């Protein structure tokens, strides 16, 4: 429709002197050549505009607008699918490059202001602990988590095995009635030596704590396996040019001592041009993401690999 509208827009206006004169004007060979040349130029312009519009459509088209709206893939044509895959594949690396530059500028600003915060570099998710008053579970405090869980389990076992039966006998709770109940059912008398309330409480608490501990430790270990092996999840490597200092010491000869064999050199400090004074450079394996795999061939992006 856009091509037809452009062709109609370059047609001559109606001749007020009659249709015969206008037909004779159009029938001349010069007019035909000029119109043919205009039509071909318009076709080329329209094709370029269509390609530009398709690129803009591929760049601005969003399949998933948000968590509430998901569009159907079946309605898309093959060319649309290819254009959207290409545009999104390019956007992945553009966003990674933007994140890398933003982090470098953030580190430079923190260095200029004297702010040193190493926790910002470790942005992997933390898991909240199920035990109250404990910090979120990470690989750093995993030993504290082990010690707390084992001490809690040991306390429950001691309470259920020693303290609770002693308190029941002193307070007169259970004991004889439970023994009579076992004897009336003609069950082994060894069962009367175990309090069912204490046994169920201790066994259930220990089982629940152990199961939750195993699940959360497995989550932390899975996150460790997903980290990049080179940068250990930080996304950065130490700059080899400045030895992670962010500055270079350059010595320049100034003058020679009388005799001509020795020269006096002065040193000056300047910011490292390789890392821009940050002391760290981008990890080429994870592209500053800290994850083990960050490319278009990631199984999370391409499910057919």
UniProtKB/Swiss-Prot annotation:
Expressed in young leaves, curds and flower buds. CXXCXGXG motif repeats lie at residues 228-235, 272-279. Keywords: Chloroplast, Membrane, Nucleus, Plastid, Repeat, Transit peptide, Transmembrane, Transmembrane helix. CXXCXXXG motif repeats lie at residues 239-246, 283-290. It is found in: Plastid, Chloroplast membrane; Plastid; Nucleus. Residues 206-297 are annotated as: CR-type-like. The chain crosses the membrane at residues 144-164, 197-217. Residues 1-54 form a transit peptide. GO terms for biological process: chromoplast organization; positive regulation of carotenoid biosynthetic process; unidimensional cell growth. Signal peptide: none annotated. GO terms for cellular component: chloroplast membrane; nucleus. PANTHER family: PLASTID TRANSCRIPTIONALLY ACTIVE PROTEIN (PTHR15852), PROTEIN ORANGE, CHLOROPLASTIC (PTHR15852:SF74). Its sequence is related to the DnaJ family but lacks the J domain. The CR-type-like region is similar to CR-type zinc-fingers. Involved in chromoplast differentiation. Is associated with a cellular process that triggers the differentiation of pro-plastids or other non-colored plastids into chromoplasts for carotenoid accumulation. Associated with carotenoid accumulation in de-etiolated cotyledons. Controls leaf petiole elongation by suppressing the expression of ERF1 genes. Interacts with ERF1-2. Belongs to the orange-like family. This is Protein ORANGE, chloroplastic. It comes from Brassica oleracea var. botrytis (Cauliflower).
């Amino acid at each position: 429709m856009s091509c037809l509208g452009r062709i109609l827009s370059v047609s001559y206006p109606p001749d007020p002197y009659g249709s015969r004169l206008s037909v004779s004007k159009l029938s001349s060979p010069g007019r035909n050549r000029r119109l043919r040349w205009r039509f071909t130029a318009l076709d080329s312009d329209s094709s370029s505009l269509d390609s530009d519009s398709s690129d803009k459509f591929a760049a601005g088209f969003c399949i998933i607008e948000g968590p509430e709206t998901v569009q159907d893939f079946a309605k898309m044509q093959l060319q649309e699918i290819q254009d959207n895959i290409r545009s999104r594949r390019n956007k992945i690396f553009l966003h990674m490059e933007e994140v890398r530059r933003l982090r470098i500028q953030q580190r430079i600003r923190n260095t200029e202001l004297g702010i040193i915060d190493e926790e910002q570099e470790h942005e992997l998710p933390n898991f909240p602990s199920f035990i109250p008053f404990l910090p979120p579970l990470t690989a750093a405090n995993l030993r504290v988590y082990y010690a707390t869980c084992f001490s809690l389990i040991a306390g429950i076992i001691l309470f259920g095995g020693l303290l609770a039966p002693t308190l029941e006998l002193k307070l007169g709770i259970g004991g004889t009635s439970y023994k009579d109940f076992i004897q009336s059912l003609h069950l082994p008398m060894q069962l009367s030596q175990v309090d069912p309330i204490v046994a169920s409480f201790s066994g259930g608490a220990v089982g629940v704590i152990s199961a939750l501990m195993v699940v959360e430790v497995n989550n932390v270990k899975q996150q460790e396996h997903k980290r990049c092996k080179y940068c250990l999840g930080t996304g950065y490597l130490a700059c080899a040019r400045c030895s992670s200092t962010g500055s270079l010491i350059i010595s320049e000869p100034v003058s020679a001592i009388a005799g001509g064999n020795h020269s006096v050199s002065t040193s000056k400090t300047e910011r490292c041009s390789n890392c821009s004074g940050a002391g760290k450079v981008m990890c080429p394996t994870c592209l500053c993401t800290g994850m083990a795999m960050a490319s278009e061939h990631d199984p999370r992006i391409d499910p057919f690999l």
